[in-house]
């Protein structure tokens, strides 16, 4: 899904680093997969992949399955991880993450 945007080896390393429940850290993950250093356009492409229902927002249920966008058999995030991730990205408090919020979160 991220072909041409991210490197497979980087994705594998990032997923390996957060395999254990409650070990997911969005900043570390974005850095490891190489998203932090990507152009705004590439970050928007990543957003479009994660926004599975194409609503223009990443909702809590999509965040829970965030890792599965990178590898189909990756684990779901725990409720705690999902809520922390949402809180970090949802700067306007509407309960979901828009593309500008996502870009800011990746680049933070």
From Swiss-Prot:
Keyword Calcium: yes
Limits of the EF-hand domain: 38-73, 77-108
Sequence intervals crossing the membrane: none
SMART domains to which the protein is assigned, alphabetical: EFh (SM00054)
Residues bearing PTM N-acetylalanine: 1
UniProt keywords, alphabetically: Acetylation, Calcium, Metal-binding, Muscle protein, Repeat
Pfam family, one: EF-hand_7
Residues annotated as binding Ca(2+) 2: 90, 92, 94, 96, 101
Family of the protein in this entry: Belongs to the parvalbumin family.
Other information: This parvalbumin has an isoelectric point of 4.25.
Protein's recorded name: Parvalbumin beta
Organism encoding this protein: Cyprinus carpio (Common carp)
């Amino acid at each position: 899904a991220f072909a041409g945007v991210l490197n497979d080896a980087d994705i594998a390393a990032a997923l390996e680093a957060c395999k254990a429940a409650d070990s997911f850290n969005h900043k570390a993950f974005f850095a490891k997969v190489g998203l932090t250093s990507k152009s705004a356009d590439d970050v928007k492409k990543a957003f479009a992949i994660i926004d599975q229902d194409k609503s223009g927002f990443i909702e809590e249920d999509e965040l829970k399955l965030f890792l599965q966008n990178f590898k189909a058999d990756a684990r779901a995030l725990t409720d705690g991880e999902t809520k922390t991730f949402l809180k970090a990205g949802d700067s306007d408090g509407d309960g979901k993450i828009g593309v500008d919020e996502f870009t800011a979160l990746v680049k933070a």
